[in-house]
Amino acid sequence: MNLNSIPAFDDNYIWVLNDEAGRCLIVDPGDAEPVLNAIAANNWQPEAIFLTHHHHDHVGGVKELVEKFPQIVVYGPQETQDKGTTQVVKDGETAFVLGHEFSVIATPGHTLGHICYFSKPYLFCGDTLFSGGCGRLFEGTASQMYQSLKKLSALPDDTLVCCAHEYTLSNMKFALSILPHDLSINDYYRKVKELRAKNQITLPVILKNERQINVFLRTEDIDLINVINEETLLQQPEERFAWLRSKKDRF
């Protein structure tokens, strides 16, 4: 299968998987126009849409796409039922698309009903995990998001993390503010800075590398614990995650 990214709005990515026959899966189409343009340019035949959560920048293009291609099956969590979803899926279930089985993973935090889709090596994680960061807590709690990220971090090393936004540079600036001497973070920041200077995408990322540079996945890392302990003593990784998320909200 081929993985494609379609830019939308200011910083969204709509992901598309297509097979050799031209059948395709569309993930979080917040805007129909760039997707329709890509479909026409590549002669794709849309079979399915995956929705991760109910926010408009992830679901806004569904209606128009389904009107154009009524055969499309729209998978999504319960919270997207009024956004065009025709097949509600929940944690532990699977969606069989393009001859591949995608596992549904509940990842509450950004929204209460947020889900991700995984079929090795592809992880479509919406607004749960970003490169160098994680989603804001609009509906869920820090504890929920921490547990959600633990689930995703436990996936295979070679997982391709397909995030829904180009937030990597700002996330790495935050990471440097927390761990300014970390070699992995510094190296990745330089790489991302060069890519963004050329207006190039920083995604997808390999999960093994992401665990090294994403402070939100390093809440049990001794270097991070020492930094946090300089300000406040927090015993549990969930508490350290909440501390980081609060810092990032104000960054």
Swiss-Prot record:
The keyword Metal-binding applies. Its EC number is 3.1.2.6. Transmembrane segments: none annotated. CDD domains: hydroxyacylglutathione_hydrolase_MBL-fold (cd07723). InterPro entries: Clx_II_MBL, Glyoxalase_II_hydrolase, HAGH_C, Hydroxyacylglutathione_Hdrlase, Metallo-B-lactamas, RibonucZ/Hydroxyglut_hydro. It comes from the Bacteria. Binds 2 Zn(2+) ions per subunit. Mn(2+) and Co(2+) can substitute for zinc in reconstitution experiments. Substrate binds at residues 136-138, 165-167, 245-248. Type II glyoxalase that catalyzes the hydrolysis of (R)-S-lactoylglutathione to (R)-lactate and glutathione. Is more efficient than the isozyme GloC, and plays a major contribution to methylglyoxal (MG) detoxification in E.coli. The two isoenzymes have additive effects and ensure maximal MG degradation. PANTHER family: HYDROXYACYLGLUTATHIONE HYDROLASE, HYDROXYACYLGLUTATHIONE HYDROLASE GLOB. This is Hydroxyacylglutathione hydrolase GloB. It comes from Escherichia coli (strain K12).
